[in-house]
């Protein structure tokens, strides 16, 4: 009798589960970044900035109910500007997430970060040039403080994207700056590995493919800008912002699956 009951239960259970809908994910995302995140050089950054298009990309994917976001990208900023101790831009990031959380209390909290472009400059931006070890220390300080305030939040760290080796506007980047930028990649990987030991399942390596992609497609997807060392390429145009958003979106989507 017991065996017969178990057999009937096993046969019926898949149909019962099939009828149950898994709840879709709602996200609160705060984007941390510089002019690229902000949408500089775009005609309509409110509609075209990478964070806006990342949200649009995510909302087209299965399993996503709603994405609420705040764009905290600010032109010219470095990891130094976002350090908690500076009490300048870090409080704004924290307040942005608190506002999203107050309005959408059941949503998953996620910080999407792409910093490093201005850190890598030879001169100009605050704290530049930032060495690779110092970059690690700065990003860790930002994450640690945010993690204290939002213990369940997820963190997705994207590689800062490529720029042309003659980039020189108000800040000087050039070849040495680009090499410094690329030295940050291993630091991000090290950070993720370290957090995996202490806070497993919270800090993830985000997009790693955009730098190589834009190095190949910069003529079509970056705005040409006149600089002190000729025409340089630093900021994505509308098409480039869409491509970057897709890279970010895929990385974030993989994390929440």
What role is predicted for each listed range?
Residues 1-24:
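Bacterial Sec-dependent N-terminal signal peptides
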Residues 19-73, 102-103:
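Serine-esterase "nucleophile elbow" of acetyl-processing enzymes
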Residues 28-33, 37, 68-73, 109-115, ...:
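Structural recognition of the beta-strand scaffold that forms the well-ordered cores
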Residues 40, 79-83, 118-135, 173-177:
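Surface-exposed cleft-lining segments at the edges of enzyme active sites
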Residues 75-98, 219-230:
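Charged, often glycine-rich, active-site loop that binds/positions anionic groups
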Residues 87-134, 163-164:
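Oxyanion-hole/transition-state-stabilizing segment in secreted/luminal serine hydrolases
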Residues 163-209, 238-241:
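Substrate-gating cap/lid alpha-helix
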Residues 225-257:
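Histidine-centered active-site loop/cap adjacent to the catalytic His
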């Amino acid at each position: 009798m017991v065996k017969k009951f178990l057999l009937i239960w096993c046969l019926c259970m898949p149909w019962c589960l099939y009828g149950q809908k898994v709840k879709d994910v709602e996200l609160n995302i705060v984007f941390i970044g510089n002019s690229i995140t902000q949408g500089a050089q775009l005609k309509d950054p409110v509609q075209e900035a990478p964070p806006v298009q990342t949200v649009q990309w995510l909302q087209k994917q299965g399993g996503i109910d709603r994405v609420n976001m705040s764009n905290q990208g600010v032109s010219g900023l470095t990891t130094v500007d976002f350090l908690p101790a500076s009490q300048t831009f870090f409080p704004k990031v924290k307040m942005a997430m608190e506002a999203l959380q107050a309005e959408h209390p059941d949503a998953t909290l996620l910080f999407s970060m792409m910093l490093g472009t201005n850190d890598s400059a030879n001169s100009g931006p605050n704290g530049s040039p930032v060495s690779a070890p110092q970059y690690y220390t700065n990003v860790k300080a930002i994450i640690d403080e945010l993690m204290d305030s939002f213990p369940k939040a997820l963190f997705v760290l994207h590689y800062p994207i490529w720029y042309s080796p003659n980039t020189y506007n108000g800040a000087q980047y050039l070849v040495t700056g680009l090499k410094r930028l690329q030295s940050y990649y291993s630091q991000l990987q090290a950070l993720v590995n370290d957090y995996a030991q202490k806070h497993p399942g919270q800090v993830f390596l985000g997009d790693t493919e955009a730098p190589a992609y834009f190095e190949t497609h910069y003529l079509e997807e970056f705005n040409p800008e006149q600089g002190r060392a000729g025409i340089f390429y630093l900021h994505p145009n509308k098409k480039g912002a869409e491509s970057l958003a897709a890279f970010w979106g895929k990385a974030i989507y993989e994390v929440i699956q």
